[in-house]
Structures are given as structure tokens and as C-alpha cells.
Amino acid sequence: MSRPVVAIVGRPNVGKSTLFNALAGERISIVKDTPGVTRDRIYADVSWLDYNFTMIDTGGIEPESGDVILSQMREQAQIAIDTADVIIFITDVKQGLVDSDSKVADMLRRSHKPVVLVVNKVDSFEKYMTDVYEFYNLGIGDPHPISAASMLGLGDMLDEVVKHFPDSSKQDDEDDRPRVAIVGKPNVGKSSLINKLAREDRVIVSDIAGTTRDAIDTAIKYDGKEYIFIDTAGLRRKNKIKEDIERYSIIRAVSAVERADVVIVVIDATEGVTEQDAKIAGIAHERGKGIIIAVNKWDAIEKDNNTVKQHTEKIRQILSFIPYAEILFISAKSGQRLNKIFELIDVVIENNSMRVATGVLNEIVTEAVAMQQPPTDKGKRLKIYYVTQVSVKPPTFVIFVNDKNLMHFSYTRYLENRIRDTFGFRGTALKFITRERKENE
């Protein structure tokens, strides 16, 4: 089930970052020791009641020219409209209602996306409620007073946000077609890839309008099986500032990855793996999605007998945090190896849904422990009682031990490698959870 996406929009200095940090807390999706994973706080995982969602901070995009504040607000609003299920529109009670608020409210209203209007910096409800009522003039619903800095009113605001989430459980029950996100930095050939796939022999294509983010998903039937391709291309922005475009492409990638079963990360063979490529791949890795790395423009590379090997090693070195990812060298222009994409998608989906019987799993772990003893600390040795798989997408395993503080990440990686040696889990992240139990339990 994909997570709903919530975007925060607001003028500079109204408290977007304060609200973002207040909601994210320590759950912000930054893996400190994982190379290539974005650290610039664009998105975070948030939980409220029984709901989990992804929050996107649309701030930090600077306009090239024109009215700075209004232009920036329009940029943010467009990103939110493009990517979000629900939009939090944050205003400032102390600055009051200003013209740019009204203009952006018009944009949001025309989008027909759910908008939760928030009035920030209401440190005293008794003192400021009369000023809060002024924001009814925006005509986009009830204003919700909060103080992000003091954590006041956030519960009521979140109650309103989750009311607007789509019923994704119904969607998942009704639609079991594999969903494939094509992601990558601008100009690597994402749209060309989808267009070429759509023209392949044995393919039937149809567009699906009116999805939750007003994108056009493409249904492609290949050899009698239908796949939904999610395209993050088509940046509807005139701004050419490099940092802005990169930030925007990451935001679009987050949205697409949330909805996908398999993520195809497209990189440019003529450029190699860039920092931006690594950030986007990191999003898919964090979300536990199946990953295929499509090295596009392979026809533009001069080759000898070692070219594929050398490029593969270089990619593995830079993207060392996803050693399980499948790599495919393609040309969207010529169609080279595109027929392999559907085959790989099927393999990755099958592996991402694989279950391993507890008995078989523990035979592997017992053998692995015999080959390499668990670590010790101050004379105390880690004991592994048993391992069981608890879920799929991604395959998730719980390791029961005597003291989880003794379970070093390197030993978890060792066990993961032994499990992969037996079952492969091609293109699939594996998640491990360590829990303590007493020996006689």
C-alpha cells in the first residue's frame, strides 16, 4: 500500500520548516551512514493515529526573476499540485492575510486537491482567534490555528489532514497490476524510455488520467500482462536554476516511488553515476522498493570486451548501498535491450514478494553462525535464537537475540549475504529487525 503524500506550501518566514521539523521529529528519513541518500530534508515519514504518510517540504526553491515572494509561492503551489494527495497551506497570523496568499489560494482551489488551511504563530488562541477568522476570506475552508514552535494545535490539524487521504486499500484490492516508476534526473531519457517501450512489438498502450496526482500513468500490456508505468518527466517549470531543477526532480521522484512496486532508476551512460542519481536511488532504497538501474544512451559509448564489466564495477562502487539492484544497459533511442526490461520487472516483483519458510531460514542462519561466530563485547557473546520472516515488499526478517546491543550492523550484513546466497532476492532490499528475548521464552 502506497503512502499518501502531503506537501507544505507557504510564504517565506511563515514557519514551514518549523512545522516540518515539528511533525517529522526523529522520524525524518535521513540515513546518516548510507552514502547517496538525500540529507537535505526534502521529505520525511510521519505517523498519526493509524496513518503513515510522506511529508514534502516544497520550500527552498528560488525564482529566477519577477516578484520574488509570489513567484516562489507559485512554484511551491505547482509542486504541491503535481505531487500531493493533500496540501497544507500555511499562513502567518502575525503578518495577517496578504495578496500573495490570496493568489496562491486561487491556484490551489482550481487544482481540486484537498487543502488544509493552517494559520501559524497562534501562541495564544484567546489572543489571536479574531485574527484567525480573517483567513476565512481565502475561501478554501476553515483556518486551523497552530503554533508550530510550541506544538499547539498540531493534533487537530493532523486529524483534518488524514480525513482527506485516498482509500488506497480499495485501490490496492482492485488493481494488482505491477506499478513501475521511471525516475532519474532531468534529460536522462525517462520519457523516451516509456515512449519506446510503448512502441515495442507485442505492446498495447493506454493512458490513465485522473490519478491522485493528476499525472498520466501509462498502461502497457506486454505478452498479455499489463504494467502501469509512472513517469516523473515533464517538468512544468520555466526556472532553469540547476539546484531548483534537481530539488524538483527529487520531489517528483519521492511521489512516484511511493506509488511503485518497482523503481527503474535511469542514468546517463555518457555521464556516469552522479550525486543526483545516487540521491534518487537512495529514495527507492529507503522505501524498500525493487530497483532496476537502467544505464541509458549505451549506444553512445565506445566499447571493447571489458566495457560492460568496467561500467558495472563503477556503478556498484558508487551505489554501494544498493548492491542488490539489477543493472541493465539500454538505449531508449535504438531500443537496445528494452525487451529485457519486462523480464527484469517480473523477476524483481517475484523476489520482492518472496517468503522463506522459518525452518529453512534457520538452517541457513545456523550454518552461517557456525562458519562465523557472532561478536562479543566484554566477554558477553551474541546469541541468535531464531529468525523468522514477518512480511514482504520488502521481505522483512526479525532476528531474536539475547542482547540486541551486541548485534553489529556488519554481522547483520553477513547474515543477509548468506540468505541472499541461497535465495537471491534479485533487485530487492531486505529489512532486518533485531528483538531481544529470554533464552527460555
From Swiss-Prot:
Family (UniProt): Belongs to the TRAFAC class TrmE-Era-EngA-EngB-Septin-like GTPase superfamily. EngA (Der) GTPase family.
InterPro entries named in the record: AAA+_ATPase, G_ENGA, GTP-bd, GTPase_Der, KH_dom-like, KH_dom-like_a/b, P-loop_NTPase, Small_GTP-bd
Source organism of this protein record: Agathobacter rectalis (strain ATCC 33656 / DSM 3377 / JCM 17463 / KCTC 5835 / VPI 0990)
Gene Ontology MF, one: ribosome binding
Keywords, comma-separated and alphabetical: GTP-binding, Nucleotide-binding, Repeat, Ribosome biogenesis
The name this protein goes by in its record: GTPase Der
A Pfam entry, by short name: MMR_HSR1
PANTHER family for the chain: GTPASE DER (PTHR43834:SF6)
Residue ranges occupied by any KH-like domain in the UniProt entry: 354-438
Amino-acid positions noted as binding GTP 2 in the UniProt annotation, renumbered to this chain: 184-191, 231-235, 296-299
UniProt-listed PROSITE patterns: G_ENGA
Quaternary structure note: Associates with the 50S ribosomal subunit.
Function: GTPase that plays an essential role in the late steps of ribosome biogenesis.
Binding-site residues, GTP 1: 10-17, 57-61, 120-123
Domain EngA-type G: 4-169, 178-353
HAMAP family documented for this protein: GTPase_Der (MF_00195)
Organism domain of life: Bacteria
One GO biological process term: ribosome biogenesis
Alphabetized Gene3D superfamilies for the sequence: 3.30.300.20, P-loop containing nucleotide triphosphate hydrolases
